[in-house]
Amino acid sequence: MKTLLLTLVVVTIVCLDLGYTLKCNQLIPPFYKACAAGKNLCYKMFMVAAPKVPVKRGCIDVCPKSSLLVKYVCCNTDRCS
């Protein structure tokens, strides 16, 4: 009985992910990574000349400003980039 209770507690902790971390897509979207502490935004960077093709994706703490050549899109939910 104690073993069953302990198993349920462990499963609950794993499922709830008590130390929540943001998950951001990598360059190829089916793959993602958990962000480090303090990195609370996902970002997608692409060239303005080719807006449909992302150049880089990942985790970041502050969304960079876009320029004439490069555009950044940031969001704060799991796998949103």
Curated annotation (Swiss-Prot):
Expressed by the venom gland. Residues 1-21 form the signal peptide. Keywords: Cardiotoxin, Cytolysis, Disulfide bond, Membrane, Secreted, Signal, Target cell membrane, Target membrane, Toxin. PROSITE patterns: SNAKE_TOXIN. Pfam families: Toxin_cobra-type. It comes from the Eukaryota. It is found in: Secreted; Target cell membrane. Shows cytolytic activity on many different cells by forming pore in lipid membranes. In vivo, increases heart rate or kills the animal by cardiac arrest. In addition, it binds to heparin with high affinity, interacts with Kv channel-interacting protein 1 (KCNIP1) in a calcium-independent manner, and binds to integrin alpha-V/beta-3 (ITGAV/ITGB3) with moderate affinity. This is Cytotoxin 8.
